[in-house]
């Protein structure tokens, strides 16, 4: 039987111990984790294969199975992400700002760990290691609750991490997992505010809504990517197509994948047939785009209101024709999830206008939305992509897992 009260208390104590460690101590533990991931590859992949088999038996779709899948290459990538975290500067103890006050007090604002973090995620076994490594680097303890789809993978990954922690002389309770699939435990975790300081969900809209509705702990909302790219009439069309192909097809199951393509009306008849020839996906198009794409021989269906709000997580692509940049921004404001949006244009003035008017965590000029990623941003393995404005926004790396404290030093100073 899982006792979250016991887990929370142990995590709180582990967080205190982690907060006192040097960067070298934490990096040594991370090195042990990376080595254990590689030395235990066979066992990890065998456990993951069980999850994949069960997912197929249960009829899960290809997008979920892709997120669930671990391969030797992906596992090596996860281990290398841990090593990259080692190479990053430790933000804990960093001076943010400070100065001498009129009272004579020396006032400093320094970065400190958040404390205990709860992470709830679905078919993403890589999150187990990503979150554990970032939390350890920043001196935070973590309680993980993965989806039932990943139970075999998560169990062995947490064992690997805990064994590495013990080898490094650190409390294994710094990284704990809820392995019981009982959903009541999720609700209990969301209300464990006596011990847990922050909840980070990683999954679909339903999971985020559940956490937001029931948590008595601050929740980081994000990761739902209804991402747009607007092709403005001055764009280099051939180069624009290469960006669109990358944004849509490189890895369709990710949250930074392009879901809706906005085309300026003045170039639609010229551009869309070129796109259809280069990008053979299933299109969901508005009336005018449907006619053009159908005539070009593309596989196309009529787009619906629900489609425009959908995170496809596959190669389906919405196409909407807009009159100008004003209409493009209005569409994004109505249907976007404040994740990642892009404009393809040769106009610096319009690019600046797009950046100023689009209120998303990441806004791109002449680049793919696929770059919204902690590794690509140089942050290391991300814990999440936040689409809210507090406490963090965009890919959440190390600094997003810290808070700060004010430290005032005086000479027996009293307030007058």
Curated annotation (Swiss-Prot):
This is Gamma-glutamyl phosphate reductase. Keywords: Amino-acid biosynthesis, Cytoplasm, NADP, Oxidoreductase, Proline biosynthesis. Catalyzes the NADPH-dependent reduction of L-glutamate 5-phosphate into L-glutamate 5-semialdehyde and phosphate. The product spontaneously undergoes cyclization to form 1-pyrroline-5-carboxylate. The keyword Oxidoreductase applies. Belongs to the gamma-glutamyl phosphate reductase family. One of its GO terms (cellular component) is cytoplasm. PANTHER family: DELTA-1-PYRROLINE-5-CARBOXYLATE SYNTHASE, GLUTAMATE SEMIALDEHYDE DEHYDROGENASE. The keyword Ribonucleoprotein does not apply. Pathway: Amino-acid biosynthesis; L-proline biosynthesis; L-glutamate 5-semialdehyde from L-glutamate: step 2/2. It catalyses: L-glutamate 5-semialdehyde + phosphate + NADP(+) = L-glutamyl 5-phosphate + NADPH + H(+). PROSITE patterns: PROA. It is found in: Cytoplasm. One of its GO terms (biological process) is L-proline biosynthetic process. Its EC number is 1.2.1.41. The gene is proA. Its main location: cytoplasm. One of its GO terms (molecular function) is glutamate-5-semialdehyde dehydrogenase activity.
């Amino acid at each position: 039987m899982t006792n979250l009260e016991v887990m929370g208390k142990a995590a709180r104590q582990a967080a205190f111990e982690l907060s006192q460690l040097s960067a070298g101590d934490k990096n040594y533990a991370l090195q042990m984790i990376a080595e254990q991931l590689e030395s235990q590859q066979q066992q990890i992949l065998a456990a993951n294969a069980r999850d994949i088999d069960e997912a197929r038996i249960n009829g899960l779709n290809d997008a979920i199975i892709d997120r669930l899948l671990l391969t030797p290459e992906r596992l090596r990538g996860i281990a290398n992400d841990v090593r990259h975290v080692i190479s990053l500067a430790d933000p804990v103890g960093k001076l943010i700002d400070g100065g001498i006050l009129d009272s004579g007090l020396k006032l400093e604002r320094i970065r400190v760990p958040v404390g205990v973090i709860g992470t709830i995620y679905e078919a993403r076994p890589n999150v187990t290691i990503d979150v554990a490594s970032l939390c350890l680097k920043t001196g935070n303890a973590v309680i993980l609750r993965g989806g039932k789809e990943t139970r075999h993978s998560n169990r062995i990954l947490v064992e690997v991490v805990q064994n590495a922690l013990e080898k490094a002389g650190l409390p294994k309770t710094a990284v704990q997992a809820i392995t019981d699939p009982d959903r009541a435990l999720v609700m209990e975790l969301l209300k464990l505010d006596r011990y847990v300081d922050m909840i980070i969900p990683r999954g679909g809209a339903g999971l985020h809504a559940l956490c937001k509705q029931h948590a008595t702990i601050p929740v980081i909302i994000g990761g739902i990517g209804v991402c747009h790219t607007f092709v403005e009439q001055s764009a280099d069309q051939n180069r624009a197509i290469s960006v669109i192909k990358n944004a849509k097809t490189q890895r369709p199951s990710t949250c930074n994948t392009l879901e809706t393509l906005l085309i300026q009306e003045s170039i639609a008849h010229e551009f869309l047939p070129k796109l259809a020839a280069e990008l053979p996906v299933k299109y969901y198009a508005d009336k005018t785009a449907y006619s053009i794409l159908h005539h070009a021989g593309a596989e196309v269906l009529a787009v619906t209101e629900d489609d425009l709000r959908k995170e496809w997580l596959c190669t389906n692509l919405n196409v909407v024709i807009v009159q100008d940049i004003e209409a493009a921004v209005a569409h994004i404001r109505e249907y976007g999830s404040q994740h990642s949006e892009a404009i393809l244009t040769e106009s610096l003035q319009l690019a600046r206008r797009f950046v100023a008017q689009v209120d998303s965590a990441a806004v791109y000029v002449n680049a793919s939305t696929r770059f919204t990623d902690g590794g690509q941003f140089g942050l290391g393995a991300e814990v999440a992509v936040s689409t809210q404005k507090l406490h963090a926004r965009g890919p959440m790396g190390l600094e997003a897992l810290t808070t700060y404290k004010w430290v005032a030093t005086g000479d027996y100073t009293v307030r007058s």
